[in-house]
Amino acid sequence: MILEVAILNVIPGREDAFIEAFSKAQDIIKKMAGYISHQLKRCLENTSQFILLVEWEKLTDHTEGFRGSKEYQVWKGLLHHFYDPFPTVEHYE
């Protein structure tokens, strides 16, 4: 199992809209091959920052399967305009 860790810095004032968009986007990722689970947590000290933790069966399920899919294009359209700067994403085993 691989853990994807993404630090998401949302443009201040857009947090509620981001949470609403993420509630739609999470339905996309849940259907992807190799997906196990995910959590989105909001930072207590910096309420514009979130951490996204996604468990994948293997690294390529995320880096090739999800990111190479048409579903990822929908995910990007829902979420990427909220970020500044663009998220740091790393993987752990």
Feature roles, as predicted:
Residues 19, 23, 69-70:
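Conserved GNAT-fold acetyl-CoA-binding loop/helix
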